[in-house]
């Protein structure tokens, strides 16, 4: 595949057999421009501020696009009727790898399918749950801005097991809490057989052993419905779809039955006939679980710049993020906090600097890479009057009390952070990360979802992920521009084809700096 792509790239951009001649011209062009730049810049050093401004422009545009959630409109009250499904293999705390297919009906009843897998690509099914019940929407949430509260009742839950090893483990675990619940004499559960977990639909019947399975559907307690509209360059027209956000689940499985959600899980997308992935999930059921195709797994290389893809919800505020990774194990982070789910009303922003370790493959979460992040410098910028008052009332543990003014940043490193917003320095945090190629070929970076238990935040390695960040500047870490095949080298253009992208970028950067200097 790589060879084929290189051949097409060479034919299109390098002119086949003329690649050496064109490549030599390109190198010469770069050298001439670099010499011009060196002669124009004092001490032969590029102006780091110009380079920085150039690298930030795309990222800054994306952040401005998120401020106000351009192209996103809230649907009030939520339109639940219809079929909703996961758009990727979701990683839940635990970890659990899951695909969801939820149906809500006009009579307030629902039929929900949850498919669980033993792998992070949702290719090897372990078991599934089919949940039936009713849901009633309530008032706007006082806890999570933009969410609608709901009350639900589960009437029946059935389970189908697909994996023999998982079935044996589940049977032993459940029978410890509910002796005899799985009453077969064998230690194994029958595969592709429906087991009854809850049944309140039959009069006089009572079956419930959900506590042993850490089962809860409290995600139905808060609901948010959004309509997304964006321009499709492929179709040359605007396209729209709906997304459904349901409540988050506790990161400690044993606490799920007692936790009331305050944030969201990844959104579900409403079924559309022109959505091929939707169609694929739509055609599955408990005896025919969805099996996703294999995807490339990328090594997590922390470099370049990354920015939020949406206005993200937190348990207190909403946030957009901009992370910058350097090649010397240092990093910077910009965090912009808002009062509202459209990220229109700013509260404060934080700028931090620190270091990070090299990554190690996670033993707990398949496909994940673990890091240790240290934050040792911090600046805070209050962006509304209430936040200024809050910071000015500190006990000299968040810069000097009374020194804060709106939209003026202050460093809080000397006071070891800022107690008013609950941050201490230096701060060490265990991280989990993974990378994937998103829609349209954009690299995505997922970093860990911290523990719901505040006392454990940063101390334990996450087992699930936050909303992804999108690559916005710097070298694309998912493009390998150095590896060439033997056949390429025999044609005499392998190394040149591989380095053409790098040379093009050097040429562009040199020209831009020279242009700005004059």
Show the residue positions of the predicted features.
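Tryptophan-anchored aromatic micro-motifs
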Residues: 42-99, 111, 135-136, 245, ...
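N-terminal secretory signal peptides that target proteins for export/translocation
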Residues: 1-21
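N-terminal glycine/threonine-rich, aromatic-flanked beta-hairpin/loop signature
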Residues: 46-50, 67-69, 75-80, 90-174, ...
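Short, hydrophobic/proline-enriched secondary-structure or compact coil segments at domain edges
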Residues: 111-113, 150-154, 237-253, 332-334, ...
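Cleavable N-terminal signal peptides of Sec/SRP-targeted secreted and luminal proteins
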Residues: 21-40, 503-513
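C-terminal GPI-anchoring signal of eukaryotic secretory precursors
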Residues: 474, 478-504
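Mixed-charge, low-complexity intrinsically disordered segments
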Residues: 153-224, 374-431
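Extracellular secreted precursors and ectodomains with disulfide-bonded cysteine-rich loops/domains
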Residues: 57, 87, 120, 176, ...
């Amino acid at each position: 595949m790589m060879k084929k792509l290189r051949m097409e790239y060479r034919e299109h951009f390098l002119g086949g057999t003329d690649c050496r001649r064109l490549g030599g011209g390109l190198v010469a062009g770069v050298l001439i421009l670099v010499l011009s730049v060196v002669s124009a810049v004092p001490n032969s050093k590029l102006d780091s501020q110009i380079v920085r401004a150039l690298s930030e422009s795309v990222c800054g545009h994306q952040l401005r696009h998120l401020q106000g959630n351009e192209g996103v409109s809230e649907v009030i009250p939520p339109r639940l009727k219809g079929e909703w499904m996961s758009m990727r293999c979701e990683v839940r705390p635990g970890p659990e790898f899951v695909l969801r297919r939820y149906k809500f009906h006009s009579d307030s009843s629902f039929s929900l399918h949850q498919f669980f897998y033993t792998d992070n690509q949702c290719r090897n099914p372990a078991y599934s749950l089919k949940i039936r019940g009713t849901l009633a929407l309530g008032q706007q949430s006082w806890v999570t801005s933009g969410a609608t509260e709901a009350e639900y009742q589960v009437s029946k839950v059935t389970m189908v097991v697909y994996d023999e090893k998982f079935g044996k483990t589940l049977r032993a675990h459940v029978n410890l809490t509910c002796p005899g619940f799985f009453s077969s004499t064998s230690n194994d559960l029958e595969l592709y057989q429906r087991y009854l977990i809850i049944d309140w639909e039959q009069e006089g019947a009572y079956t419930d052993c959900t506590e042993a399975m850490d089962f809860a559907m409290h995600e139905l307690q808060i609901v948010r419905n959004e309509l997304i509209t964006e321009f499709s360059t492929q179709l040359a027209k605007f396209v729209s779809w709906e997304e459904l956000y349901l409540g988050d689940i506790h990161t400690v499985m044993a606490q799920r039955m007692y936790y009331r959600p305050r944030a969201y899980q990844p959104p579900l997308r409403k079924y559309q006939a022109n959505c091929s992935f939707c169609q694929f999930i739509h055609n599955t059921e408990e005896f025919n679980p969805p099996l996703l195709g294999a995807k490339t797994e990328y090594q997590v290389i922390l470099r370049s710049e990354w920015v939020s893809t949406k206005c993200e919800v937190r348990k207190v505020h909403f946030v957009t993020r901009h992370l910058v990774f350097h090649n010397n194990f240092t990093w910077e982070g910009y965090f912009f906090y808002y009062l509202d789910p459209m990220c229109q009303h700013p509260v404060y922003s934080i700028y931090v600097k620190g270091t990070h370790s090299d990554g190690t493959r996670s033993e707990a979460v398949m496909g994940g890479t673990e890091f240790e992040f240290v934050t040792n410098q911090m600046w805070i910028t209050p962006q509304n009057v209430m936040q200024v008052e809050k910071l000015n009332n500190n006990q000299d543990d968040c810069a000097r009390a009374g020194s804060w003014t709106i939209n003026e940043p202050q460093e809080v490193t000397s006071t070891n952070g800022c107690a008013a917003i609950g941050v201490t320095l230096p701060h060490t945090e265990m991280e989990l990360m993974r990378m994937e190629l998103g829609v349209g070929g954009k690299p995505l970076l997922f970093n860990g979802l911290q523990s719901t238990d505040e006392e454990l935040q940063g101390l334990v390695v996450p087992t699930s992920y936050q909303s992804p960040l999108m690559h916005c500047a710097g070298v694309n870490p998912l493009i390998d521009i150095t590896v060439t095949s033997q056949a390429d080298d025999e044609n005499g253009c392998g190394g040149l084809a591989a380095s053409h992208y790098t040379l093009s970028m050097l040429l562009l950067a040199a020209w831009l700096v020279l242009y700005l200097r004059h």
